[in-house]
């Protein structure tokens, strides 16, 4: 039986500057590349028309086409990782399995199970840093404790980067070390219960001009000055290392956004309870109203507040929402409507193409006040004030809520002044 190494693709669907793939291809044995559609993960994608599955499938097909240039192919499975690796162990003499580290709580548990299974069979399991520039224990306080405030974390992060310049891994130059695998078969998406969507996804190309104007225009939702790279960062079709170097050259503000991403991943690693509960436990005592009709109006963009409704309609139609508007709609749900942040977090998780557990959780807990380094509970965004400041000509609103000046437009779901006072009283009571 031929001895091989295996590379397990997950949130790293690219061949260039892929750390784990580089290590696998450098280890001296032919490499079998695999991707696993795990039913435990897919249960979080209940909509058969979820465009994220189309994105993943296209990425896998692209990888497969690249590998065929080297007389190999990507092996795609639909099963649990434990079952897949059990089968692969009967097909090959596996020396090692290589992959890139996933920092989410469920992924950590999964990888430990797989590592234990493989080691019981005498197979080594190697995981590498690829999703982030610095992993959870590299940017910490002098006493080794994690940061829970962004500004000192960011300062320390940049100091580390200056002291340890980024190293690239030229995995794309080693594809000749893939194992020869002749196969004309590549699975269709409908074989795992999903329908292919006719959708144009954002480019993964980095726009230098956009980044040069990012700082001054990023808060204006009508302007096309955001990178739209979130989906590529989520599924690893772009290298965080390359993107960081690019940001260093063109935009300090954009670099800070990448650091926020790293920060929230570190928070989730060190404080896994935040995935389901408030980072600050006292906030779990807030008595939410959780009115289902109000929630439905928020979801469908019928609150009577044009900026909120524009954001929700954009999300529902495109799977994207401008970051400034994300803050406004999240604040509105949690403070104007007094609906648990977890309801909004879950809705975003179903709708966002770029959904990332750490970033989504961190953003929602920031807006509700329950997170680390969050907006104070008494900061209640005024949708009208935000509109005047960031969409003064209503270009963004007119695109998504064309009826907003007509009699047919929904009446405000709640008065802003009343909602603000109610939120302050509710938060004060819950935080006693």
Question: What positions do the PLM features span?
Answer:
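Trp/Phe/Arg-rich N-terminal binding region typifying the photolyase-homology
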Residues: 1-161, 250, 313, 425-430
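Active-site-proximal binding-pocket segments
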Residues: 225-398
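Hydrophobic alpha-helical segments, especially transmembrane helices
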Residues: 11, 112, 262, 325-327, ...
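Glycine/tryptophan-enriched, flexible segments
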Residues: 123, 145-283, 386-432
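A short alpha-helix capping/helix-coil boundary motif
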Residues: 40-44, 63-66, 92-95, 164-171, ...
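Residues within alpha-helical segments
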Residues: 25, 312, 345, 417-424
